[in-house]
Structure formats: C-alpha cells, structure tokens
C-alpha cells in the first residue's frame, strides 16, 4: 500500500515536471530573448536565462553555480523522495513535497541542458517588475506555502486543544 501511495505522489511531481518543461519548450520556441510579449496588463512573457538561484542570486558567478545548484537540487530531490516515503500519512505534506520535487527537478533539468534556468513569466505593476520565474518556481513556492499552512494548522490545533 505504501508504494502505491508513493507512486501517486511521484506522479504529481512528474506532472509538474512535464508542465514545466513543456511551458519552457514553448517559451524557447516562440519568444525572443529579453523581448517582452504582453499577455495581460500586469503580465508579459519574457524569455530569460537565470544562471543563479531565486531572484537571480549568485547569477554573476563564474559558472560554478551551475553544478553546485544541480547537485544541490538532486540531493534535495532524493531527500524529498525519502520524506514522501516516510510521511505518507500526512497527505497535505506529501502533496506539498510533490510540488517542490517536480519544480526542483524541472530547474535541475534546465541547468543540465542549458547551463541556466529558463524563466519566462514577468509580472509587473507600472514600471516595477517582479523577478521573472517559471512553472517550476511556482510549484516550489506553492509547495512551501502548503507546508507552512499545514504546520500553522497543526500548531493552532494543538493550541486550541490545550486551552
């Protein structure tokens, strides 16, 4: 039974990975580097390569960050798979970890194939732009938010029971 549940959570990660890679393939096929394509009043498609990490942190490195973040992403993925195996009774946590796993693998694949992560979603208000991101980044953020929400629910549940 445990392996069937694990397969379900791994399927979520694979779906995230496929959606991420298909969206990046579309961006690479249809967008020109650095030229915004308006989609909505607050959103552009904007093809960029990010050799760093979130918010382009360490993007100016000499190239070491490609393999460092690749190894880090693979190590995190192995740990997440182990966590999925051990935590199957907590469905919210497993869904969150599956989203993070799919996103991490999507960005690792980019680093291996392109030497950088492919970003293409540009949210903005007037002249202020949020750093460009992708589906993998979104899945990682949603997964992290679900983990925080789950922990807060547990914490407040325990607090309410003790009063």
Swiss-Prot record:
InterPro entries associated with the record: Peptidase_A8
Subcellular location: Cell inner membrane
Lineage, broadest ranks: Bacteria, Pseudomonadati, Pseudomonadota, Betaproteobacteria, Burkholderiales
Transmembrane parts of this sequence: 9-29, 39-59, 67-87, 92-112, 130-150
Alphabetical list of Pfam families matching this protein: Peptidase_A8
Identification of the protein by name: Lipoprotein signal peptidase
GO biological process, one term: proteolysis
Main enzyme class: hydrolase
């Amino acid at each position: 039974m445990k392996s069937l549940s694990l397969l379900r959570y791994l399927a979520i990660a694979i779906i995230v990975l496929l959606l991420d890679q298909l969206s990046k393939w579309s961006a690479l096929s249809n967008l020109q580097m650095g030229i915004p394509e308006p989609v909505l009043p607050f959103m552009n498609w904007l093809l960029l390569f990010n050799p760093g990490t979130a918010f382009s942190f360490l993007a100016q490195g000499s190239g070491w960050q490609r393999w460092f973040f690749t190894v880090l992403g693979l190590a995190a993925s192995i740990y997440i798979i182990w966590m999925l195996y051990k935590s199957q009774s907590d469905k919210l946590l497993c869904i969150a970890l599956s989203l993070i796993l799919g996103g991490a693998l999507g960005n690792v694949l980019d680093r291996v194939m392109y030497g950088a992560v492919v970003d293409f979603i540009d949210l903005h208000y007037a002249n202020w732009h949020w750093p460009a991101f992708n589906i993998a980044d979104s899945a990682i953020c949603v997964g992290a938010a679900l983990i925080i929400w789950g922990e807060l629910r547990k914490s407040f549940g325990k607090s309410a029971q003790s009063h």
